[in-house]
Amino acid sequence: VAIRPLRVGELAEVLAVDFDDSEGIPRLNADWRWEDQEQALLIACSSLIAIVEPGDGNSDVESGKSRVVQFSHFSVKEFLTSSRLSNASGEVSAYRIDSENAHTILAQACLGSLLQTHDEIDGNTSKDHPLAEYAARHWTIHAQFGEVSSRLQKGMESLFDVGKPHFKAWLTLYDIDIRPPFISTFSAFIPYNKSSAAPLYYAAFCGFHDLVEHLILNYPEDVNADGGYYKRPLIAALAGEHFQTADLLRHNGANPHVRGDQESTPLHSAAYFGKLEVVQKLIEYDADINARDEYEWTPLCWSSRGVHFKDGSVLRLLLERGANVNARADDDGCTPLHRASRFGALEAVRLLLEHGADVEAVSYHNMTALQVVGKSNPKAGQGRCAEIRRLLIEFGAK
């Protein structure tokens, strides 16, 4: 389940983790480290593994830096992960690899490594803490698998404790907020904010619900603290589509009304990218459905552009919830119908017309929707553009 092939030193470090600490926090035990790491791994895994030079196809493992560990044959992995193995008789069933347990062990090992690092990150960090680089980049991915995070609560609470140096050290090694592992839902509108974000922001961003609850209890002032790529913990939770966590933040006073550089709101962005569930949540949180950005564009304007237009569900929802179907943009005087026509979004045009869009509205350039069909989307195709023109004429365009 490793995100990339593990180097010998990284996997050997896992053998030095005490998973049975009395406080429930994984800890590295320096006395458990082997001087001959390859021998340690071969003793533990025998012929199930092979230690090889890193392959050229994996850019995340630099050639010549360290040998990597892999299964000796693809059939070994198939056998160890097979459901049939769990039903086998005798001790052999204990060797079955369960994905959730494997992610749990790797996440715990990563936490154990990060909890040994401090804020003095330098060139010796990788040497002194072989697993630290991998841990900083990937531990959250392992922790997000299934119910893994619920098994890591004590370790995560320790890592996210602002009174200790580990949290800062982790972000110094690799800041997941700078290179988000999730699809960037709001990046086009909410600007990157280099100011440091509170631990609550990162917990929300990753969707660690129990950890968010713990941090709200201990640091309630951070619920609306500014900082980070998405500016607020609530918006970070929505960007990762962690809706239960977002509800928890909202219930504890999180304010969804934030603005980007161009005065755009999260609703503008969610509408543009066609994120239906995010749009639903923002409306539930009383977001202004007719909010205008710097150019007087509303969320409906962005939704109707068609670049990320899917099945019309977002546009339909906005219209049903009272979005102004004829809202004009300040920069060019175009309405949502102009946008949808210009980008060749047939279903958007149909929905807007059915909800009363002014088919004869004229932009500041003296153009109607009929005159701009397909102008901004060469891929729209002649057939679709012809259908849009037919539809506009059917609704009264001249």
Where are these regions (language model features)?
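Conserved ankyrin/ankyrin-like repeat signature
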Residues: 211, 244-245, 278, 313-314, ...
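Ankyrin repeat domain, specifically the short helix-to-loop turn at the C-terminus of the second helix
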Residues: 214-222, 247-255, 280-288, 316-324, ...
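"… SH3/SAM/PH, and C2H2 zinc fingers" -> "… SH3/SAM/PH, FHA domains, and C2H2 zinc fingers"
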Residues: 223, 239, 257, 264, ...
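Leucine/isoleucine-rich amphipathic helices and adjacent mixed helix/strand linkers
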Residues: 1-225, 232-251
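Ankyrin-repeat-protein effector appendages
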Residues: 355, 374-398
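Ankyrin repeat A-helix N-terminal signature
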Residues: 202-207, 236-242, 269-275, 302-311, ...
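Alpha-solenoid repeat scaffolds
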Residues: 120, 149, 222-223, 256, ...
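Ankyrin-repeat boundary/"N-cap" motif
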Residues: 191-200, 226-234, 259-265, 292-298, ...
